Amino acid sequence: MIPFSHCIRNLLRRPGQSCQLIAGSCVVVLLVMTAASMNHAMKQTLGNTGDPLNTIIVGAGSEESVERSEVKQGVAEIIGSSISGIRQIMDKPSLSPEIHFNGMLSTQDGKSSQALIRGVQHVALWVHQRVRILEGRFPNPGEIMVGRLAHKKLGFNRSQLQIGQILVFNGEELIISGIFDAIGTVLEAEVWVPLQDLMTYTQRENLSCVVVTLDEARSFGDLDAFTKRRLDLELVAIQETEYYTKLSTFYKPIRWMAWICAFLLSIGALFGGLNALYASFSSRIQEFGAIQAIGFNRWKILFSLIVESSITGLIGSLLAFGIVVLILQGITVPFSIGVFVLNFTQIILALGAGTGLVLGVIGGLPPAWNCLRPSLPETLRAA
């Protein structure tokens, strides 16, 4: 077997080509890991948002989008008095009548951006139990409460969404009264407004939905039966987890686009690496002949060349790991209903290492085999 140190020396003898191959491997591994992290983060964020005990009551025909839903006022009281399996807190049912509205928010300096605005009452904190008020308090009339990551979704500076700052919505100036989080969900990129205020600002008479927290998941059947029995109310009950699972399915093509872009760019980098390896190995044909002449067969030389190219792939992976840990880890990526945070898990890092290794093997095999095909006399006579 050819010594491992021989492979290292060959890489050091051609630092320019080695750096080129390592950089190409780094780019490919980085693209693959970023695509994997985006897929995982978006899917996990949408999955975390749904509570298995929560049910969303929407208008019939609006199961795909709460924003398009219309639910009559008073439905929450009717449900609270008709269903026995609703969780009670302080002898009151956990029912949150809400309006979900996509609208433009502006800062005082005129910068505008579209936000997901949720009109709620205090009881929303009972229903959405992941929500925690970090600073300030729940909004009173003329005030709003913003999510911890709302500035990422809106593209504003963090300082513009601090307590006491003013945002403009539909010509009304609203004072930020609090900041909340809901770790790992899309909620923490939202803006919450008192329900009655939002109905006034948007001139709406109906709700978007009613979110109900049940004592246990099996109580959903009673709630579902109620909506089917009361045809006059035109309601549909959908479990919150199912709603966000459908949203995740809706965004699946976007997640696939990330993979497709990473794949196409990786193919380009792979061909560039193949070209560099062909040039590198072709200039060493005489060296391969000399190694065969002293007793090493072609298979051992082939293995040595694959090890050599695999080393560049693994070094590229290590560089990609460094970029991921120092720069990309924790970056927030906005999308239409919120933001997700890139998280490079151990599985994703293992995928990156495997990609670098496979890239080295696949990239090194064709040029190595092409250079080892000539007979020993032809190899020794090669210029």
Pin down the residues of each PLM region.
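Short beta-strand boundary microenvironments
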Residues: 114-157
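A short amphipathic helical element positioned immediately N-terminal to and/or at the very start
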Residues: 3-12
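Hydrophobic, regular-secondary-structure patches
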Residues: 26, 30-114, 135-137, 200, ...
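Hydrophobic alpha-helical transmembrane segments of multi-pass inner-membrane transport and secretion
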Residues: 15-42, 252-287, 310-319, 362
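Mechanotransmission and gating elements of multispan inner-membrane complexes involved in transport
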Residues: 83-86, 106-112, 138, 150-152, ...
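Hydrophobic alpha-helical transmembrane segments
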Residues: 4, 18-22, 322-323, 346-354
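Transmembrane alpha-helical interface segments in multi-pass membrane proteins
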Residues: 278, 286-332, 351, 355, ...
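Short cytosolic juxtamembrane segments of multi-pass membrane proteins
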Residues: 370-383
